[in-house]
């Protein structure tokens, strides 16, 4: 297994006289790769899901592994102004985040191309006019996700009496 990552953050605060400024930023970058032995459970697929699922018949003692290769990256920024007075307190700000994730997941079985499982999948594919190349990979999936969040927000708190105040706030965001 390899796991390399970097996570940073920075907070800047300052008094502007009329309001308190807070700026918060962060950055995250992680790359992971792991491999696990699948022999302990691949042999039992047929016993658990039954003979109707010949696509999982890897033989009596299959040896294999699974791998996951993944990369995550995100950046975030929030800027806030806060004012505190005798009767009125308020906050206004904005938020931005950009994140990306990509992973490849692969399961292998040694000799898969000569197994009943491969022959079954190849037969299904041939019926629909496709050819499945011989490989020890019996499962592959990949996903890439990108997300961008933006928001603005604000809040006002008005002190009406010593015992009563009126508070209103809101947030508008796009994902």
Regions found by a protein language model. Name each.
Residues 70-82, 86-99, 156:
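Conserved C-terminal beta-signal and adjacent last beta-strands/turns
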Residues 11-15, 20-26, 31-38:
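Membrane-embedded beta-barrel scaffold of Gram-negative outer-membrane proteins
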Residues 18-21, 87-90, 163-166:
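Repeated loop/turn-to-beta-strand initiation elements of outer-membrane beta-barrel proteins
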Residues 23-25, 92-94, 168:
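Membrane-embedded beta-strand positions of outer-membrane beta-barrel proteins
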Residues 1-4, 69-73, 100, 134-135, ...:
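Short sequence motifs at beta-strands and strand-loop junctions characteristic
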Residues 1, 37-67, 106-142:
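Solvent-exposed loop segments that connect transmembrane elements
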